[in-house]
Amino acid sequence: MHKCVLDVTVSVGCHSPGTHHKIHRLRNDIKQETVSEKIALFDVLERALEFGQRLGATYVELRGESGFVEYIQMDDSRVNALTQRIERGVAIRVLADGAWGFVSTGDIEGLNTAVESAYKMAKAAAITRREPIQLSEAQAYEDVVKAKIERDPREVPIDEKIKYMTDLTNTIHDYDERITAVTVKIRTASGKKFIATSDGSRIETPILLVWAYPWVSGKDGTRLSAARHEESSTHQGWEYLDTIATPEYIGEQVAKRVILQLEGTPAKGGSFPCILGPRVIGVLAHEALGHLAEADLTVQSAFNGKIGKVVAADGVSMTDDGTIPMNVGTSKYDDEGVPTSRVEIIKDSVLTELMTNREYAHKVGQRLTGNARAESYLYRPIIRMRNTMFERGDRSDEDLFEGIKFGYYCKDFRGGQAQMNASFQVGIQEAFEIVDGELGRPVTDLSISGIATDSLFKIEGISKNEFPWETGRCGKGQEAFIASGGPDIRFAKDGITFGGRS
C-alpha cells in the first residue's frame, strides 16, 4: 500500500532560543510550501478518475488533502513536544465487482499507480465476498466551501502560542496552591480538502482546527484529584482561543473542578434520583446511544431491529446534526461528497432513523445522512457522529429538582466507555448532592453506570433551557472531532447506578 504521512516533522524536548530559531525557519518553509500549492490537485485527480474508469471500476472516489498541522505540549511551563508537518496526499477508494479497494498515497504524480493498486485490491476482495457492495445513489455537487477566519493558525507565531499555554498554566497554578501539576496541549490544522468522484462531484472544503486541552492534578494532604477541559473549533481560527477559549476562562473552569474534588464529600454508592447536566447527558447521547445508531454497527447493537419501536420514555428525542452553524462536528459535505443533515435518531420516544454512508444507506434501505467521515487521507471514510444531542423538553429547573429528597447533580465528566449492548461507565469530575430539592455540597470519587437503553425509560423530565456543547474526540479506528450535549435531564431512582467511596 502506498502511504506518505509526513513531509516535514520537527520535535523538540525543550524551548530554547536556538531551538526557536530552527522552528521558526522551518515553519516559514512549511507555510510557504503549503500556501504555494504547486500542484493543481484537481487536474491530477481528474486524470486519475478517468484512468480508474478505464480500468473498469464501478465507482472511483479520490480525496486529496494539503495542510499544515502543529502540535505543542507543555508540562508545567516547559515545552516538551513541538511537532510541525505538512500532510499532503490522496485517499483512493475503488469499487469493483462489488468490493472495495483502498489505498492512500503521498505520491501525487504517481496517482495512477495507486489507483490501479486499489482496483486490483477490490478485484481480489470480490473473489471471497458473499454479498456485493452496492451504493445508494447520490447527487453530484460542484462547490467550493470557504472558511471565514480572522487568524489562520499557520500565521500565528510560535512565541504567541507558547505564551497562550504559559498564561493558561499560570492561571491554573494561581487559582489555588493545592494545584500540583498542569499539562497543556495545543493542536492546530489548516489547509484544503478536494473530493472528486466518478459520479461527478467536485468539492473543495477547508481543513481547519484549533484545539486546547489542559490536564490538571491537585493534592491536599492525602487526597488527590484530577480534571480536564477541552475546547476546539473547526470553523474559527486562532481568534477562537483569543476571544472565547481564553487562558482565563479555561484555567478557571478546570482548576475549579480540581479543588471541588479536593473539598468534596465522598460520594455514596447505590441508586438515587439524579439530574445529568449537559456535558454528562451529552456523553451518554454519543457514547452509550449514538454508536448504536451508526448503521455499520447497528446490526450488532441493542438498537438492532428496533426501528419504528418505542425505545424511550414519552417526550424523549435525540438527534445527530451536521448542519448546526459553527459547531465542531458541522460541515457542508461529508467525505463522500454527500450533504450533511439533521438525523432524528429518536423522535418522541421512537427509534426513527440511523446515521448512514452510501454503502449502508443502500444496505439498510434508509436515506443518505452525510455521516461518512475520515480522519485524514490516510483513512477510508466510515460512519461517524457529528453533533449529537438530546432535544430540549418543557420543564423548568425548579420542576426538575422538586421532590428529590436525596440525589446527585452530575455536571461534568472525566472520561467514559460504553459497549454495543448499551452498557456504560462514566467517571464524573464535577458533581453535587441534591438535598430536599436544592443543590448541596460538592462530591468526589463519583462514577455512573447502567444500561443506556434501560435508562431512557427512566427519564422523568427534560429541561427547556438552552445548553452548552461539549467538544471532544471520538475514536473508531480513527479520530473524529465531535460535539455532544443536551439539556438537564432527570432520571428516576433506578435509572442510573452510582459508584462511590461510602
Describe the function of each predicted region.
Residues C4-V5, V10-P17, K22-S502:
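N-terminal small-residue-enriched
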